[in-house]
Amino acid sequence: LANANKLENFPFFSPDGKQLYFCTCDRIDSLPQQFSNIKYRICSIGFDPQNNQFSKQVDTLIDLTNAGKSVTLPSISPDGQFIACSAAPHGCFSSWIPESDLYLYNTKTKKLIAATEWNSPEAESCTTWSSNSRWVIFSSRREDGIYNRLYIAHIDSVGNLSKPFLLPQRDPTYNQRNLKAYN
């Protein structure tokens, strides 16, 4: 499965265990000089859990390289219907890149949409799903461009998105005192 000519990371299985998803890009040997050329895609490969074998076919699901973007930090909803991910101009540490935005891939329709209701002029990244697949928590620097804060937003079963709101903290200064990033 590994390819010496590629950089591969962020692997995760589908909830049913029959697909392995991962990020991949062409290997760049002159880092950090060519860091801006790193553009990841999200791929999948079938997996047979009964026989513990991968299929031979790797499919590219999300590829924004022609749009000049790198897609990373994917997470799948527990019902397996949506993959949330971050897209940024390069690399894989999107929480540090202001242009980083969230996207959603519908595994049933094979459509990718920008999560415009969730995005801001600052970085959004690092998604996680509720157990019922209807809520997403993600990090955003929208408040000040410096500190990540956690936002929560609703998504319905067909992919309609609600406006996110700041995840309440007992102490409103918690994020500024403790962390610059959730990753």
Task: Show the residue positions of the predicted features.
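Sequence signature of WD/YWTD-type beta-propeller architectures
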Residues: 1-183
